[in-house]
Amino acid sequence: MSQESNGGPAAGGGAAAAPPPPPQYIITTPSEVDPDEVRSMADLELGSPEKQVQVQSQKFSSTSSTTKVATHSFSMSSSAGTTGQQSKQDSAQQIQQLQQLQQLQQLQQQQQQQQSQRIISSSTRSQSLQSSTIVGEATTITSGAAQILSASAAASLAQQLKAQSSTSIITSSEQRTSTSTSSSSSTRYIASGSSNLAGGNSNSASSASSKTRFQSFLQQPEGAHGFLTAHQKHVRQFVRSTSAHSEAAAGVAGARAEKCIRSASTQIDDASVAGVVESAGNLTDSSATGGSMQLSMSKLGLQQSSSILISKSAETIEMKSSSAGMRTQLTLSGGFLAPPGNRKITILSPIHAPPGLHDMLKRAQGRSPLSPRISFPGSDSDLFGFDVENGQGARSPLEGGSPSAGLVLQNLPQRRESFLYRSDSDFEMSPKSMSRNSSIASERFKEQEASILVDRSHGEDLIVTPFAQILASLRSVRNNLLSLTNVPASNKSRRPNQSSSASRSGNPPGAPLSQGEEAYTRLATDTIEELDWCLDQLETIQTHRSVSDMASLKFKRMLNKELSHFSESSRSGNQISEYICSTFLDKQQEFDLPSLRVEDNPELVAANAAAGQQSAGQYARSRSPRGPPMSQISGVKRPLSHTNSFTGERLPTFGVETPRENELGTLLGELDTWGIQIFSIGEFSVNRPLTCVAYTIFQSRELLTSLMIPPKTFLNFMSTLEDHYVKDNPFHNSLHAADVTQSTNVLLNTPALEGVFTPLEVGGALFAACIHDVDHPGLTNQFLVNSSSELALMYNDESVLENHHLAVAFKLLQNQGCDIFCNMQKKQRQTLRKMVIDIVLSTDMSKHMSLLADLKTMVETKKVAGSGVLLLDNYTDRIQVLENLVHCADLSNPTKPLPLYKRWVALLMEEFFLQGDKERESGMDISPMCDRHNATIEKSQVGFIDYIVHPLWETWADLVHPDAQDILDTLEENRDYYQSMIPPSPPPSGVDENPQEDRIRFQVTLEESDQENLAELEEGDESGGESTTTGTTGTTAASALSGAGGGGGGGGGMAPRTGGCQNQPQHGGM
């Protein structure tokens, strides 16, 4: 089988051309050629810059050489029909070709003056007569593309290239003549290779019939757009999944490809696909068989190329992607007019990865290369197919800027998973819950996938939220029922985007099961088990709770289980577990548990009475002094002089007067960058970081104009707001507010969220980030509740500080010259106020697990439903995403570069220690992690990341994949750093104070134990370990051993405090 190399004629002039790279091979789809046949796929390869200059100079050096190339290309593209007809067509079209070449010479001179380039080449493909190709740069794409596309298609392509100077677009159409031009050598040269494959020629009758049917389909109001909309997620998934190999290769090349991949993956979108359809629809010649669009990008030394080919007969849509030497092909077969059940997607991968890639990445990164499911089979003979559903064509769910704008949900690549994906073995699970995935792959391929794909964690989109598991189980029951009964599926009662065909069932269509077969019996048994599990789960749902509460309760239960094991490891582990439980778990569900009334339990009454007498004095000492009248909002100061200080026409460039304006402007120019030097901004802004950050962000987003906010009023309010942040707080000050606001701005810029939220929603989220900690006293909610503060009484112990922040902020808006929303309509103002209240209340850390469960349930439910698109078409869904976005920004310190993260950790711990000092002085119990004499910072950060931060960012990354992969990588690196910094466990501190007393008590305690346990405990006593609580009379060596994992507790010993955490280990007798 002949293979023609790509890249144009050989360079002449005595200069030796660079040797061509070895071709990459893939297996073509079985419907096209024999499965054993291999062909080259180097048609998108980019040559070296030197070779590009040589090729261009020789190709356009003379008219004769250009004529030869065009004539040869034309003869290749005219291979159909009989020999006589072919020669006649060649003769006629060669004359026309030569005439057009003369016109091209004139066009060439004009373009040389403009320093731009349009290169025209030709290529041939199997089962289609090829055409010419036009390559255009952004400056000339309109005039170039107008020759083969309509004006609207050319405009859309030009708009795509507006901000992509390094991108080239190739569009082709089958009956256009070949043209060629040249320009400056600085423009990259893209050559289209050719490969002739046996496949036969289509007769003229069938071609004309196909053309008529295709044009008729395109003329339908919602035909083509609806079909492409339904497949939009697959198109994006194809391009993005190819980036996995590009990321892997980047590790070898020493470059990071994420930015390159992210830019390239956004190129194939609604506009470009629509351009391809329009290109194909404009073809009128009966010999034309299709149109194509190709995209090429080169960044960071890596090359990303993608192409789409739509055949004229609507039989296939073929997409190819080439990234860093890795090529992948995807084919949508079945045609536009085929029933949804007959449409298939086939994905083929390279046969071989680069030599040594896997081993090198394992050594460099400690994990295997990313390998998304359904995209890259392990061998050349493994093909993955999944059904393509016929989505709604009335409105694209990807349309931005509207209340119905949605998010395309992607599959996460392999990475370290959080505890949410571990087995909840204490409770009954669905029989298939551990292998259930997002209903993309057919059931019959599950075993094949499991045997091929290795080292991929939860790459199958493992479902962990109970409601999504119930939906998946019911879908499985429905599909199994279709197989068992052989009843044809009816889609009358199903929404179009959730229609299930017979091919979704456990058995492929055309192979029904008959009663009495072993497979029939096994499938029936599995179906009954699945249905029983669904019924059990539904029976436990409480009617007054939402379905996301099921996930919240499950996650809290799993977290308690994890922390129980964590607390048993050491004294510090117990303290960290208690801190996490008391801070991040809302314990409201405890009131729903059945319990005895106090008066029904005399022993409990007596114990409470004794405890009350002992704590009466302590309560009196810890109670906060009487504050201002509760009818007033505490913390609101009198209007300061700066409220009316901006009297001149000129406002400060960045909202603050500073002698270091140039340095400040340089840093503020990076406000869209994750991990900005926020501490330097605070220094250069004369301790006004919140004002300058907020003002710059609102200016750059044009929110002052769209929300009709007077700039002077905005600066007045921000200055007043910043004055109400307590500067003496080490952590909760205006610098923290500026950091959260800047992080919120970056997350709002996520490509997946582009055009999703309105300016009012964006402004509300940023405003909420600005005010979310105003007048923070540097104390926790639990401290305020325990000390019976005026704030806790005012807000009934519920989100005390968050309610106070909102009250202070909205009260400040009433100051003269500070109402930034004065020009809004009443309805808009009410909507924004509600949004801000919801977002700020969600920053209460005790609501963390509920927020996480709500978001994960929403994402997984949409994936199980089969739509793959999260339609944010109601307030609840939209505010839920914004709440989690700001919550992520509030917990973003561990995801920042390590120097910033370490500095934030030091400030937060100092604030905790100050609260602990205050608790010690008041005779109160010192809160977890607040005792400066007994804290392990490194281990606390590892636990904080493992149980709180990583599960949250993991879910967010699932929502906006792949836009948060860099953040997750940084988080894992920071976690590994603190893990490596954990000091070795010290010996028990209480043993040295009175070793003889501890030894005696230890021996007396073990008299009732057998000799084996005695020997084990004595070994543990000699080896030492971390003790539990120090400095108390109830501390025993047995409890110290328990803390070190040496066994049970000792008699008479007092167990460690377990705060607000349920299911903590209680050290009882053996």
Curated annotation (Swiss-Prot):
Its cofactor is a divalent metal cation. Residues 1-91, 166-215, 487-516, 615-653, 1007-1070 are annotated as: Disordered. Residues 70-84, 488-506, 1060-1070 have a biased composition (Polar residues). A divalent metal cation 2 binds at D773. Keywords: cAMP, Hydrolase, Metal-binding. Residues 51-69, 166-210, 1025-1042 have a biased composition (Low complexity). One of its GO terms (biological process) is circadian rhythm. Signal peptide: none annotated. It comes from the Eukaryota. Residues 656-985 form the PDEase domain. GO terms for molecular function: 3',5'-cyclic-AMP phosphodiesterase activity; 3',5'-cyclic-GMP phosphodiesterase activity; metal ion binding. A divalent metal cation 1 binds at H736, H772, D773, D890. CDD domains: HDc (cd00077). Pathway: Purine metabolism; 3',5'-cyclic AMP degradation; AMP from 3',5'-cyclic AMP: step 1/1. The active site is at H732. It catalyses: 3',5'-cyclic AMP + H2O = AMP + H(+). Hydrolyzes the second messenger cAMP, which is a key regulator of many important physiological processes. Vital for female fertility. Required for learning/memory. Belongs to the cyclic nucleotide phosphodiesterase family. PDE4 subfamily. This is 3',5'-cyclic-AMP phosphodiesterase.
